[in-house]
Amino acid sequence: MLSLVQKIIGSRNERFIKKVSRIVQKINSLEPEFEKLSDEQLKAKTFEYRERLANGEILDNLLPEAFATVREAGKRTKNMRHYDVQLIGGIVLHQGKVAEMRTGEGKTLVATLPAYLNALTGDGVHVITVNDYLAKRDAELMSDIYEFLGMSVGVIVADLNPQQRKEAYACDITYGTNNEFGFDYLRDNMAYEKEQQVQRSRNYVIIDEVDSILIDEARTPLIISGASDDRSEMYNLFNRLVPYLEKQEKEEVENEQEQRDFYVDEKSKNAYLTEKGYAKIENMLKKEGILEEDDNLYSPHNITKMHYLNACLRAHSLYQLNIDYIVRDQEIVIIDESTGRAMPGRRWSDGLHQAIEAKEGVKINAENQTMASITFQNFFKLYNKIAGMTGTADTEAFELHSIYGLEVIIIPTNKPMIRKDHHDEIYGSVREKFDAIVEDIKERISKGQPVLVGTASIEASEVLSTLLKKKKIRHNVLNAKQHEKEASIIAMAGYPDNVTIATNMAGRGTDIILGGNLEVEIAQLEDPTPEDIAQIKAEWLKRNEAVKKAGGLCIIGSERHDSRRIDNQLRGRAARQGDPGESKFYLSMDDNLLRIFASQRMAERVKKGLKGGESLAFGFMSKVISKAQGKVESYHFDIRKNLLEYDNVVNTQRKVIYEQRQSFLEAEDVSDILADIRIDVAEQLFHDYVPAGSMHELWDLEGLEKALKSDFMIELDLQKLYEEDDSLGEEDLKRLVREAIEIEFVEKTKNLDSGAVRQFEKFSLLQSLDTHWREHLSSIDHLRNSINLRGYAQKDPKNEYKKEAFELFSTMLDNFKYEVISSLAKIRIATEEETQRAQQEWQESMSDIKAEHESVIDNNQRHDEDEQEEAPKVKQVRREGPKVKRNDPCPCGSGKKYKQCHSKVE
């Protein structure tokens, strides 16, 4: 019934395309009129549109004219005319949806339409790409169009200094990577002066390869961190011991003879010790003198040893060189499992990166303490409007809609797609599969057909390369090790009988043109004459026709990826813009996807039925593969959804802290803010010793006096005052405490330089808030890692997490207020000698903070070494008395730690 209705009225997607086609007709009707405009008249349109917006007109009304303007500018500056389907794509993006456009349909050009329209508001447009190369390339390619129309274009890449970043963000349209935009947001919320912040408002963002960024990278939060204590000796110790542990094939074994020391869960990438393994590692640690004879690993004080052990166990059993990471310049570089790209600067958390460094014998860098973090899911939700482009979003439409509220619209191709997709061939072993791939390649290049082979890992690409070399078949390899040659290798991939082996092609961003890339060939000529160019074109046309006759580009997949979307991205490299093309996947029952997620019984039956070199290639196996991929996609979706649910708790807190911090940063004078905080602190302190509504017998006035003296340098004899006038009630005493704190502060600052005091107050607020937020993030991490254990007590871990995270947050805010008022209460007029010493201490403290920020920026390759900041000239202030640390005995004499007594204001 549903299919019948769809045949009559069309699918939702078809109805949408039909609806926006009317807008396209309107844009097309304007084309003759805009063609008659002079360059100056066309350029003046930008000013006209901005005036109309200022007078109350909305962007939707301007769309047909604005798009017609961009199309005409494209024709005049780039000799590129936007197709009708590209106009549809632009409308979809403007409406805050995801446009699924096939490879070769010109997504880069499409983005110019909504980018120009939305930049007319003056609030800026961000265009996100997956790497620096594409950000620079796309900005350079399209800058002629934007600049012709009076729009400024900026690019954010890794090696820019803060001033260059600020200028790029101030442009009408800014290109850059998701990482750069995210890290700049975090760094802006760590700045100590408004001028240090580089970003402005987050208005409208267009995300290229939106599925890769919002889905594949959603599980990896952006983290800015500083180094903690060095524990390299512990990693080296466990790295030496772990290889002695034997792997058990599965979690449950039938008899003791099969039991080994540990087993792995490849789905979750975790490794677990068995009881036998615990006993074995305990004995080894006792021999090493790390554990006492009567000690055991289960003891609470050995939890850190378990941390090192688990990290090293995972490093040895689950993470492989040239598959999950490579070693480059004596550093571990992670490989993106979705794109096959190296990701320098990224590090695994939970000690895993250090464990892999120990395993590979490179320098072990200290574990980091989180200073600021955010997931891409929550970062992009900060924008007023999100839009995205990709070649393969339809399979992830549900997730994009449920998490981001993004609707996926499939854009028709400009020309019919005529790619031939062959059935998968499945072999019994990996070796048989690779042999079959080599034979297929040999046959195809004999007729002049170019071949692109997609592999899931560097290791697979190198194995295949070795086999091709033995057969003397010329080929190029593109993986994380050869990323510098990427553009030139892809430019050659469409040549007749050319063979290219590449790890996952997602995000490569360069079209493979049949016969080779003509523009690249012409660009390589030095001072070419018209005759030279004509000859190159003639040769290219011959090659182009020859490749088409041979069947176009053939895509060979060496295995299925966990996600159908990644397979579709690989397939999508063939048959662009109506060209012919083919695709075929080769699998073996030993491939990770089938080995981990397909049923074991089915795998055994297939292997048993296949003789050496034989393969299966028919319908039911496609269903098996599709079912296995569906399991993986569902599993990963649940992980991402779970991550978001937990991160939303921290995200709410992050918004509160960052908004509060920004108000501190922007305020010229924070004295009113501090006055309000002093009132809160006085009330909190008072009720710590005088419970609200309690009888006099429960009052601890002596303890309150001690706290006032030790934390606020205030001598106030409350007991004497009460004895002299027993009519004093709770409210009267509270008022006395509040007034004493206020008067003491006014008295101590009235003779100080007001500018220096204001500066010191602002810095104290920012530094104290940062310190407490950082400690809070660490506490939240510990809570998150242990909260699932609540399930054993029949409690919902998520609800428990929300409740305890809120309690931690409330306590953190109280502690922040208390500490900042306490520190400001300990300033006094200093002697000249003390002034010089105070200035030196101040500069050292500022240096520590800057070094902390520098270490973070260095970790992410974003530091401008030439930039030097002048230390604030605060000469008249210094702390009186030593600072009480959180774990020191509380000065009030209670016998408790400070953090459990006066640091904690309920």
Curated annotation (Swiss-Prot):
Function noted in UniProt: Part of the Sec protein translocase complex. Interacts with the SecYEG preprotein conducting channel. Has a central role in coupling the hydrolysis of ATP to the transfer of proteins into and across the cell membrane, serving both as a receptor for the preprotein-SecB complex and as an ATP-driven molecular motor driving the stepwise translocation of polypeptide chains across the membrane.
Location(s), subcellular: Cell inner membrane; Cytoplasm
Textual note on the cofactor: May bind 1 zinc ion per subunit.
Cellular component, GO annotation: cell envelope Sec protein transport complex; cytosol; plasma membrane
Region annotation (Disordered) ranges: 852-906
GO biological process per UniProt: intracellular protein transmembrane transport; protein import; protein targeting; protein transport by the Sec complex
Protein origin, superkingdom: Bacteria
Keyword terms: ATP-binding, Cell inner membrane, Cell membrane, Cytoplasm, Membrane, Metal-binding, Nucleotide-binding, Protein transport, Translocase, Translocation, Transport, Zinc
Residue numbers binding ATP: Q86, G104, E105, G106, K107, T108, D511
Chief subcellular location: membrane
Basic residues compositional bias, start-end: 896-906
Family membership: Belongs to the SecA family.
Entries under Gene3D superfamilies matching the protein: Helical scaffold and wing domains of SecA (1.10.3060.10), P-loop containing nucleotide triphosphate hydrolases (3.40.50.300), SecA, preprotein cross-linking domain (3.90.1440.10)
Ranges of biased composition (kind: Basic and acidic residues): 852-888
Presence of the UniProt keyword Iron in the record: no
Name under which the protein is recorded: Protein translocase subunit SecA
Membrane topology value: Peripheral membrane protein
